[in-house]
């Protein structure tokens, strides 16, 4: 017998946060539709690196819990990497120490000081985003949800008893919320010359950093974090700098064949907005946006909290 469906929800936004939220709702028995302006493969989520780690996201006391919930989910999904796009991979955060992290870090399995004493070593989920987004969509459809390409210009006109706003940077104009700002990230994808571990070295006082993530489709090199920059066009000089910084860590990267350039705009905000509000006609609006550079890192934790808010609104 088909599960009894409780009520209708439309999730606006089909990146990793929107799709994960929709999956949680659908598997809780909610009749859910995702409305997205662009297909998932053209969202910011699709161009992410994407390593599980709280990066450029606040508030830390809440982020830690959301991230750990997501970590547990990804560790289970990593048992089926070809299907889910998730693998657990070893790597090093250079220049980072345990005492600068929040209480959540004590619950990350295997997180330790690196052997050379110059950072933190860990086994962390590395997500192949195009594969993972396709898997989330398939899981949603299996649970009875639907995905539709729709352009939304007014959240109050979305025809559902509960509307969930997962529009990321789009919330700046749609809500409107001027606290949402773009942080431009540029990446270079190269043919992997044999790198099997990830690496990051991030200077939060600079708009450039150094990291590389081995993905099935190539080695992802980064990166940048340019506040209030809107351009989606790759900058050749920036790309050359990215390759040079990564090659200073692993010299074999210098001669690797370039496969692609990627640019994404992280939806930065002073704090994630995760709350329920009434619409003018009494229906409910649940906001779940502003995840900065850590949407995939907190996706499951935020999705479950958003689902609880939806349930409270029913």
Labelled PLM ranges:
Residues 5-7, 156-162:
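Core beta-strand elements of the Rossmann-like FAD/NAD(P) dinucleotide-binding domain
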Residues 59-69, 119-135, 233-238, 297-298:
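Short beta-strand to alpha-helix junction loop
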């Amino acid at each position: 017998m088909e599960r009894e469906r409780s009520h209708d929800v439309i999730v606006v936004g089909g990146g990793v946060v929107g799709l994960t939220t929709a999956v949680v709702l659908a598997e809780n028995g909610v009749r859910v539709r995702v409305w997205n302006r662009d297909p998932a493969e053209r969202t910011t989520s699709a161009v992410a690196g994407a390593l599980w780690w709280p990066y450029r996201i606040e508030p830390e006391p809440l982020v830690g819990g959301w991230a750990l919930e997501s970590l547990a989910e990804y560790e289970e999904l990593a048992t089926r990497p070809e299907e889910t796009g998730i693998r657990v991979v070893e790597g090093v955060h250079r220049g980072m120490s345990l005492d600068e992290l929040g209480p959540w870090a004590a619950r990350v399995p295997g997180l330790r000081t690196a052997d050379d004493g110059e950072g933190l070593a860990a086994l962390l989920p590395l997500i192949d985003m195009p594969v993972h987004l396709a898997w989330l969509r398939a899981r949603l459809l299996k649970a009875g949800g639907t995905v539709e390409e729709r352009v939304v210009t007014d959240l109050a006109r979305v025809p559902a008893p509960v509307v969930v706003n997962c529009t990321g940077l789009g919330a700046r104009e749609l809500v409107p919320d001027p606290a949402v700002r773009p942080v431009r990230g540029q990446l270079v994808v190269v043919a992997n010359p044999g790198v099997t571990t990830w690496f990051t070295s991030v200077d939060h006082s600079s708009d450039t950093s150094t990291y590389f993530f081995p993905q099935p489709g190539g080695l992802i090199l980064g990166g940048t974090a340019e506040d209030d920059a809107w351009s989606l066009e790759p900058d050749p000089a920036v790309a050359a700098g990215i390759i040079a910084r990564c090659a200073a860590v692993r010299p074999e990267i210098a001669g690797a064949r370039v496969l692609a350039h990627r640019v994404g705009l992280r939806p930065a905000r002073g704090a994630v907005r995760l709350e329920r509000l009434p619409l003018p006609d009494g229906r409910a609006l649940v906001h779940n946006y502003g995840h900065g550079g850590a949407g995939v890192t907190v996706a499951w934790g935020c999705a479950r909290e958003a689902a609880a808010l939806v349930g409270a609104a029913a």
